[in-house]
A protein has these predicted regions:
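Amphipathic, oligomerization/interface secondary-structure segments
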Residues: 23-33, 38-158
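Internal, Lys/Arg-enriched amphipathic helical interaction segments that engage polyanionic partners
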Residues: 1-31, 37-38
Length: 158
């Protein structure tokens, strides 16, 4: 019984995320669809692609919420290239600015950071050839986390 409720929650949250983000930018619909296409094909390469697409969605979301530039200025006034982790920092910074409740923001911060780090680590290992196969469980867990976190963030920013 509980599994069915969680499954219904996931599906309704997923629909909410897709429709809301698609209304902001149609590219989200394509990116989120690509995750499903890669996820359900089941091959090791496609599971890795699903993780890469999760990363793209998070970066795209960061650009929509808090646009980042190609260059950042460090504390000494020098221009630096923005790294991909800047996307994560922009999401977290925007969350802290938007929400008054410290505990809920810290939980979201932990969730977003954990998902980002997991996707980065799995991608890095795959690129180095250390571990070429992402398991289905790892991929499904990351996708589930993505939709839950995006749903929470959308509700916060609306």
């Amino acid at each position: 019984m509980r599994g069915n409720s969680l499954s219904r929650y996931y599906e309704s949250n997923k629909k909410f995320v897709i429709s809301t983000l698609s209304s902001i930018d149609e590219q989200f619909k394509e990116e989120l669809n690509n995750i499903d296409v890669h996820l359900y094909s089941g091959s090791a390469n496609n599971l890795s692609e699903a993780l890469w697409n999760i990363r793209k969605v998070l970066c795209h979301y960061a650009n929509v919420v808090c646009p980042i530039s190609d260059e950042t200025i460090d504390a000494e006034g020098r221009k630096r290239k923005a790294k991909s982790s800047v996307c994560l920092n922009h999401i977290i910074s925007a969350l802290y600015q938007k929400v008054d409740k410290q505990i809920s923001i810290e939980l979201l911060d932990i969730g977003v950071t954990e998902l980002w780090n997991k996707v980065e680590k799995l991608n890095a290992l795959g690129i180095k050839g250390v571990r070429t196969k992402v398991t289905e469980d790892e991929a499904f867990q990351c996708v589930s986390q993505l939709y839950v976190l995006l749903g929470q963030m959308i509700r916060i920013f609306n």
